[in-house]
């Protein structure tokens, strides 16, 4: 399981983060690049996705009666309004990433002649700049 909680839209060695494990978890908590106020999503293959959907929707199985469950399940669904908020933001993700990248460039420029060093992307990485960090060498 890959923890991609904060890396939506980032790349490592040319691959999307969230694509390295059999399953990855992305957070939509209130402070993330995309938010639904909580919850998140998993990234996986179709078979694993169907299994996860079954378990997270109370393990109901199709049946003429309303409440037939074939195993213990959970109610981990987002309310529809939260899901709609997330979908609308996902449609804007490229623009959000571009704005975050531009802002990081401004921080880098503003800090270049100060005692602070902007922590930039390592080689082979493309950050979503969800958070930005600096190092204050004179204070280490």
Regions found by a protein language model. Name each.
Residues 8, 17, 34, 74, ...:
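Short clusters of hydrophobic/aromatic residues that line enzyme substrate/ligand-binding pockets
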Residues 7, 13-21, 123:
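Active-site-adjacent capping/gating segments
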Residues 1-14, 46:
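Catalytic PLP-binding core of fold-type I/II PLP enzymes
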Residues 1-3, 27, 135:
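A cross-family glycoside hydrolase active-site/sugar-binding cleft signature
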Residues 19-57, 80:
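Active-site PLP attachment segment
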Residues 1, 25, 117-119:
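Structural detector of well-ordered beta-strand residues that form the stable sheet scaffold
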Residues 11, 47-140:
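PLP-dependent aminotransferase class I/II
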Residues 4, 29-30, 86-89:
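A secondary-structure boundary/capping signal
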